[in-house]
């Protein structure tokens, strides 16, 4: 009880950061749901085109998002050390870095026709998908601006703008989809491609909202963000890239793992694919909580280290683990006991419900491993340690997790082929290995920081 009383203040700070981030993440998921519903009501071809287009767009933008995420711990370090004069420069250098990568993303998306040719899709399907990508690509500059400014605000422990502007984006998204998908109010009827145009408008709306807030908020006036425009400093730009690129790749390894499994189980039939998708959809929704805790602990750890308090950094980690562990335990129990009921919300098909319920039982364990690895990697980002976590994530997800899943799911080498359940055991194995390896890495990094801080105290005392 005494331990809790002493540390309640830090827990409250962590919770206050986590809440708005969670709501912001959920609004982004809801935008995707709106796209899916609007396109689905238009037709199966439009829905499929939006799905494939999104599968190209999202991985393409991970590089920008990863670089922007690097700004949060960098700025939180500066905030903790009261180095506020350097924040305006690092914000602008981060914008340069993300802008460069944004151009690369646009160039990469130009390969979409080639990818669709390899897939040998129908002409109508190809046309809608390419139109979707054409329209949504206009939103990439807005996405760059929004991502940079969002992480600037969050780096200063101000997460409310993410929440409010997330709602603004959702409020723009619903009518914009309705207008452009169905051709209302004199606008052309674009079908699934209209979702791309709506998303581009949303991204620009969120970017402009974030610009207005950032450069008019009284709390940022002392930072003098517009007093001087800094030229690109390649040392600072490469510094952001050096921290952010491994974050981007870690995200890519995780996203691509789930995409690869979806392709591998596709030949097992629609029942298996549908059950897998239901379990994955629910798990993805649940993951928003540990993801938000992870992003919040990055900020608290970065601030503590900037303030020269490595012990408080590890306290934030322990409290995040406590918070995440309780959530994972309760949520895992709900998923295990109520898996069938949750699956029935998606479909009336008994075969799909039964298989999904089995997968949900595995997803309950998966959630625990996922929570611990997410919080560990978020804490390491607070230490600005991203290179080795990227390597550990790759080893855990691909050579280990996917291999275990493939052997158990599609071969008889160990047990009779388990289908989708085998791949979910692979997910659990990979994420559990990641959680252990990342925890060991964190232990090493945190001790190094504590030794360094101790030596600095001795030197200052001398």
From Swiss-Prot:
Query: Any idea which GO molecular function terms this record carries?
Result: antiporter activity; xenobiotic transmembrane transporter activity
Q: What is its main location?
A: membrane
Organism annotation: Idiomarina loihiensis (strain ATCC BAA-735 / DSM 15497 / L2-TR)
Q: Which family does it belong to?
A: Belongs to the multi antimicrobial extrusion (MATE) (TC 2.A.66.1) family.
Designated gene of the protein:
norM
What is this protein for, i.e. what is its function? Answer: Multidrug efflux pump.
Its recorded name reads Probable multidrug resistance protein NorM
What broad taxonomic lineage does this protein's source fall under?
A: Bacteria, Pseudomonadati, Pseudomonadota, Gammaproteobacteria, Alteromonadales
State whether keyword Lipoprotein applies. Answer: no
The subcellular location is: Cell inner membrane
* PANTHER family (UniProt xref): FMN_FAD EXPORTER YEEO-RELATED, MULTIDRUG RESISTANCE PROTEIN NORM-RELATED
């Amino acid at each position: 009880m005494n331990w809790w009383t002493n540390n309640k203040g830090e827990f409250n700070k962590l919770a206050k950061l986590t809440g708005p981030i969670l709501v912001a993440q959920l609004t982004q998921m809801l935008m995707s749901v709106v796209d899916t519903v609007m396109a689905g009501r238009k037709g199966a071809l439009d829905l499929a085109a939006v799905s494939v287009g999104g599968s190209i767009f999202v991985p393409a933008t991970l590089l920008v998002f990863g670089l922007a995420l690097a700004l949060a711990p960098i700025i939180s370090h500066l905030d903790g050390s009261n180095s506020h004069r350097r924040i305006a420069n690092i914000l602008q250098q981060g914008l340069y870095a993300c802008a460069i990568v944004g151009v690369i993303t646009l160039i990469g998306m130009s390969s979409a026709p080639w990818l669709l040719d390899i897939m040998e899709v129908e002409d109508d399907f190809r046309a809608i998908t390419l139109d979707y990508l054409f329209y949504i690509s206009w939103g990439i500059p807005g996405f760059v601006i929004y991502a940079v400014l969002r992480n600037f605000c969050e780096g200063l422990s101000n997460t409310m703008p993410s929440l409010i502007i997330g709602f603004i984006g959702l409020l723009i998204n619903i009518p914009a989809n309705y207008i452009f998908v169905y051709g209302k109010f004199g606008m052309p009827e674009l079908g699934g491609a209209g979702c791309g145009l709506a998303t581009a408008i949303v991204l620009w709306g969120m970017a402009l909202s974030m610009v207005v807030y950032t450069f008019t908020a009284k709390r940022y006036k002392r930072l003098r963000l517009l007093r001087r425009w800094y030229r690109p400093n390649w040392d600072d730009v490469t510094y952001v890239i050096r921290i952010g690129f491994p974050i981007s790749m870690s995200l890519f390894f995780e996203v691509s793992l789930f995409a690869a499994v979806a392709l591998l189980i596709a030949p097992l039939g629609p029942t298996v694919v549908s059950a897998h998708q239901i379990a994955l959809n629910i798990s993805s929704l649940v993951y928003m909580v540990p993801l938000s805790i992870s992003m919040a602990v990055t900020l608290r750890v970065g601030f503590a280290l900037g303030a020269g308090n490595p012990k408080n950094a590890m306290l934030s980690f322990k409290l995040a683990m406590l918070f995440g562990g309780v959530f994972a335990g309760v949520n895992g129990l709900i998923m295990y006991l109520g898996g069938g009921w949750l699956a029935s919300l998606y479909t009336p098909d008994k075969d799909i419900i039964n298989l999904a319920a089995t997968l949900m039982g595995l997803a309950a364990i998966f959630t625990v491993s996922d929570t611990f690895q997410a919080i560990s990697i978020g804490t390491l980002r607070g230490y600005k340690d991203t290179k080795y976590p990227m390597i550990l994530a790759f080893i855990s997800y691909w050579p280990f997790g996917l291999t275990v899943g493939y052997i158990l799911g599609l071969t008889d080498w160990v047990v009779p082929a388990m289908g989708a359940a085998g791949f979910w055991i692979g997910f659990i194995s990979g994420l559990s290995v990641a959680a252990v390896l990342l925890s060991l890495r964190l232990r090493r990094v945190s001790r190094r920081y504590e030794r360094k801080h101790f030596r600095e105290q001795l030197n200052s005392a001398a």
